Amino acid sequence: LAALDQTIVSTALKNIVEEFDGLNHYTWVVTAYLLTSTASTPLYGKISDIYGRRVVFQFAIVTFLLGSFLAGASQNMEQLIATRALQGVGAGGLMALTFVIIGDIVPPRERGKYQGYFGAVWGLSSVAGPLLGGFFADNETILGIAGWRWIFYINLPIGIISLIVTSAVLHIPKVKREHSIDYLGAVLMVTSVSLILLSASIYGPQYGWGDSRTIMYAVIGVILAVLFLMWEGKAKEPILPLYLFKNHTFSITSLLGAVIGAGMFGAIVMLPLYFQVVKGYSATEAGLKLIPLMLGIVSTSIVSGKMISKHGHYKRFPIM
């Protein structure tokens, strides 16, 4: 669900912004989702330690489904962005707790293999996303509802099935652990990044980089980012433990992940618009053009996961 929704929107965004006349907010439909999912991901692990894996995982599914329904019913770009942010809150739990649950039930030596399988499922969903998004976007109406709205409504039956399956088979003993949850850190992080993005992606291009609003949002965003880092150094259980960056391996892999993620998500979001507007392709054709990228993700996820489990070596794979 979470992987599908990261990519299914990309090929339909052109149709959405045309209906809502929201080209200036184009990237925010994706950014809002990624921002809230990123902020909520670290919180879910601690919350599930307190209340149990299954109930928190199911809460994440319900939150995601509610966001999906409201996104499909949106009447303007502001509503769509807000409901996509709600979807992201649910998606953060789906992404985080999947790995946590794997860690609970799979021996350490075998986790690489299962995480490889998870990566493959993630990749297949990412492949299907642009194709499904293109299919729905190219159909003006389906069952009397605008085609693009189905990119959100399709989540509902899948999510309901997931709720039924997790209720039936996910029985992990509850081991309560006391945690201090860093809500303030999450708020500071989301607010600072949001303000900086508002300055860089909306006010700067629209009103000019010297405009008072552009400068104000950028300055406040940077100040909040500094406050976030200061708070994380003092928080009992920070959302982003700064001491982790003293670990050379963690620092390098985080940097690599940021660079690769920026390029990958930039391509996933902007390439469909390029194919449709500049090249004149349909939404479905734009989705087909993304298949090579997604197939590369699928294949390397499977192979690297199995190789790490088999040999126990991991450093060579980021280099490769």
Predicted features along the sequence, with ranges:
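Transmembrane-helix bundle of Major Facilitator Superfamily
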Residues: 1-168
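Helix-loop junctions at the membrane-solvent interface of multi-pass transporters
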Residues: 66-74, 139-140, 167-172, 203-204, ...
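Alpha-helical transmembrane segments of polytopic integral membrane proteins
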Residues: 129, 163, 167, 193-196, ...
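Hydrophobic residues within membrane-embedded alpha-helical segments of Major Facilitator Superfamily
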Residues: 1, 13, 63, 70, ...
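Juxtamembrane loop-transmembrane helix junctions in multi-pass integral membrane proteins
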Residues: 21, 25, 55, 75-78, ...
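Hydrophobic transmembrane-helix bundles of small-molecule transporters
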Residues: 138-256
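Cytoplasmic-side transmembrane-helix entry/capping segments in multi-pass membrane proteins
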Residues: 59, 111-124, 178-188, 246, ...
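Transmembrane core module of solute transporters
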Residues: 1-40, 210-220, 224-320
